C-alpha cells in the first residue's frame, strides 16, 4: 500500500544515522548549520512548531496584543495561539483557497499584533500580496511552514519581525522523529525566544533518547510498504501508535498541575539532530521531487477539471490536496484505499468554531483529501493515483 505520508529517509538510513548519533553535533552546531544554509542570522531548535508559535507570541506580547491567524489549519496552531491568553481573531479561508485572503488579513490585523500565517500542505503565500495585506504593520509575523521544506530563496528575505518555523514531526517532509526549528533575521527576537525555550525545556536523559529513537525506528519501519497495510489494521494500528509515540499528549489540555506536555518541553535528541542535518543536506532534492509530482497531479486532476485543488502556480510540498463534494469524500478515501492508496483528510473543522462565521474553512475541511507526495511514491505511481481518482469519480457518480 502507498503510505499517505512520505518520509525523507528509509530504515537503512536511520540505522546509519543511529550509529553516528552518539557523536552527534551539539544543538548549537545544528542551529548554525541551518542558519548558514538558509541565509538567516539565527535559528533555534524547538520541541515542536506549536511550542515555537506560542514562544514567539510570548516573546512580543504586551497587555494589548492581539493574535490573528487562520481558521483553517492544524488544531495545534489554534491551541498555541489561545494559550497566550491574548484576544484571538481567526480569519476565514479565501474563496476556493486553502490560505487566508489578503483582504481578510488586512481587516483582522492592526499595528503591533501577532499574525500567524499557516502554509498548509506547504502552499506558500504570495510575498507581494502578503506585503500589501500586512500594510498595518503587525509587530510579529509567524510563518508556520511546518508542512514545507526550507527554501533559502525565501528565508533570506525574512524581515526583522518575521519568524519562520519548520517541523521535524510525523508526516512532515522534514521528519526527523521529533522537534522543529525557528529561523530569524533579528538576533534580539531570537534571544528572547531562546530564553523562553530554555526555561521550558526538560533535561535530555537516556530515557528520552531511548523513547525518541524507539519512536523514529517504529514509525519509519511501519511506513514501509511491506508493513504499512498491516500496521494500519485497526487493532494493530492502535497498539503501534501508542508504542511509537514518545509521549501521550492529552489533546488541548495543556496545563495540568502547572506542567506542559512533552510536545512543548522535550528537546531534540542526538538522533533527531543527526536526522535534521541529513534532511537539510537532501532538502533541495526532495523539494524538486515533490514539485515534479505535484505538477503531475495538478495537470491530470486540477487543470483537466476533474477536481478542485492547487494549480500549477501554487504547488504544495507535504501532500497534494484535492476537494470533492463532502457527500463522496469519505467514499473516495475508501475507494482508493481498496486499491492500495492511503489518503488523509487533514484538517478537521474545530468543534468549538462556528461554521457560520468561517463557512469557507468549514467547507474545505469537509471536502479535502490529501494525496501522497515524496520519496515513497514514484512519478509513474503519481500518474496511476491520478487515474484511480478519476476512476473513483466515475464509479461514485461524480
What does each of the following model-derived ranges do?
Residues 2-31:
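A glycine-/small-polar-enriched, mobile loop at the entrance of the PLP active site in fold-type I
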Residues 4, 29-44, 49, 116-117, ...:
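PLP-dependent aminotransferase class I/II
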Residues 45, 69, 182:
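Conserved SAM-binding loop
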Residues 87, 140, 341-342:
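Residue-level detector of anion-binding/catalytic polar loops
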Residues 96-192, 199, 374:
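Active-site phosphate-binding strand-loop segment of PLP-dependent enzymes
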Amino acid at each position: 500500500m502507498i503510505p499517505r505520508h512520505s518520509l525523507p529517509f528509509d530504515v537503512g538510513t536511520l540505522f546509519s544515522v543511529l550509529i553516528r548519533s552518539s557523536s552527534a553535533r551539539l544543538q548549537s552546531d545544528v542551529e548554525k548549520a541551518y542558519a548558514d544554509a538558509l541565509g538567516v542570522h539565527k535559528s533555534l531548535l524547538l520541541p515542536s512548531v506549536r511550542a515555537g508559535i506560542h514562544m514567539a507570541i510570548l516573546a512580543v506580547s504586551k497587555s494589548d496584543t492581539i493574535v490573528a491567524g487562520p481558521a483553517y489549519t492544524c488544531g495545534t496552531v489554534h491551541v498555541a495561539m489561545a494559550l497566550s491568553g491574548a484576544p484571538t481573531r481567526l480569519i476565514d479561508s479565501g474563496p476556493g483557497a486553502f490560505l487566508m485572503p489578503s483582504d481578510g488579513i488586512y481587516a483582522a490585523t492592526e499595528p503591533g499584533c501577532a499574525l500567524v500565517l499557516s502554509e498548509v500542505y506547504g502552499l506558500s503565500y504570495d510575498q507581494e500580496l502578503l506585503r500589501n495585506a500586512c500594510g498595518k504593520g503587525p509587530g510579529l509575523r509567524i510563518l508556520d511552514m511546518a508542512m514545507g521544506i526550507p527554501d533559502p530563496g525565501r528565508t533570506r528575505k525574512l524581515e526583522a519581525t518575521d519568524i519562520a518555523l519548520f517541523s521535524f514531526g510525523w508526516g512532515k517532509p522534514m521528519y526527523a522523529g521529533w522537534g522543529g526549528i525557528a529561523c530569524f533575521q533579528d538576533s534580539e527576537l531570537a534571544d528572547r525566544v531562546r530564553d523562553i525555550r530554555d526555561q521550558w525545556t526538560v533535561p535530555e536523559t537516556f530515557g528520552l533518547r531511548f523513547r525518541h529513537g524507539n519512536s523514529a525506528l517504529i514509525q519509519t519501519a511501519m511506513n514501509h510498504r511491506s508493513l504499512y497495510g498491516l500496521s494500519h489494521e485497526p487493532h494493530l494500528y492502535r497498539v503501534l501508535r501508542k508504542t511509537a509515540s514518545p509521549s501521550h499528549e492529552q489533546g488541548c489540555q495543556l496545563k495540568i498541575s502547572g506542567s506542559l506536555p512533552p510536545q512543548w518541553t522535550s528537546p531534540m535528541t542526538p538522533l533527531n539532530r543527526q536526522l535534521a542535518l541529513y534532511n537539510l543536506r537532501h532538502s533541495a532534492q526532495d523539494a524538486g521531487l515533490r514539485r515534479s509530482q505535484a505538477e503531475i497531479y495538478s495537470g491530470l486532476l486540477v487543470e483537466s477539471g476533474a477536481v478542485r485543488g492547487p494549480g500549477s502556480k501554487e504547488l504544495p510540498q507535504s501532500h497534494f490536496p484535492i476537494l470533492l463534494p463532502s457527500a463522496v469524500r469519505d467514499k473516495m478515501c475508501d475507494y482508493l484505499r481498496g486499491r492500495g492508496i492511503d489518503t488523509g483528510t487533514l484538517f478537521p473543522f474545530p468543534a468549538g468554531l462556528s461554521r457560520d462565521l468561517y463557512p469557507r474553512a468549514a467547507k474545505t475541511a469537509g471536502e479535502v483529501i490529501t494525496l501522497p507526495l515524496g520519496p515513497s511514491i514514484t512519478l509513474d505511481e503519481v500518474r496511476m493515483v491520478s487515474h484511480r481518482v478519476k476512476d473513483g469519480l466515475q464509479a461514485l457518480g461524480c
